[in-house]
């Protein structure tokens, strides 16, 4: 009886672990989204919601802008317009809303 209870416990633990493992690679890939090409066109500033910088694990440093329609757009951080947009978005998030 004790052996069958221990076996059942072991099987349940294994089942729980195997259902959780496939979700981990997706979570990791979301953390390490890399850009391999850049958007060459200037994006209208009013369409942008936020930005983030790519991980240091990526081959190219990039800014990823998120639009209000939930699209991700890669941009070259060396471009002047990208730097201006980053400053503007930083100021927008620091300004308290009344």
Curated annotation (Swiss-Prot):
Cited Gene3D superfamilies: 2.40.50.40
Gene Ontology CC: extracellular space
Compartment list: Secreted
Primary location class: secreted
InterPro entries membership: Chemokine_b/g/d, Chemokine_CC_CS, Chemokine_IL8-like_dom, Interleukin_8-like_sf
Domain of life of the source: Eukaryota
An annotated Gene Ontology molecular function: chemokine activity
GO process annotations (BP): antimicrobial humoral immune response mediated by antimicrobial peptide; cytoskeleton organization; eosinophil chemotaxis; inflammatory response; killing of cells of another organism; regulation of cell shape
Keywords: Chemotaxis, Cytokine, Disulfide bond, Inflammatory response, Pyrrolidone carboxylic acid, Secreted, Signal
Assigned protein family: Belongs to the intercrine beta (chemokine CC) family.
Full protein name: C-C motif chemokine 13
Encoding gene (name): CCL13
């Amino acid at each position: 009886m004790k052996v069958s209870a221990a076996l059942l416990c072991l099987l349940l633990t294994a089942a729980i672990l195997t259902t959780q493992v496939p979700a981990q690679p997706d979570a990791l890939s979301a953390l390490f989204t890399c850009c391999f090409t850049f958007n060459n066109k200037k994006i209208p500033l009013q369409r942008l919601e936020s930005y983030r910088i790519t991980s240091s694990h990526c081959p190219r440093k990039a800014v990823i802008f998120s639009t209000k329609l939930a699209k991700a757009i890669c941009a070259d951080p060396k471009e002047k317009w990208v730097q201006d947009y980053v400053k503007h978005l930083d100021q927008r998030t620091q300004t308290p809303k009344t």
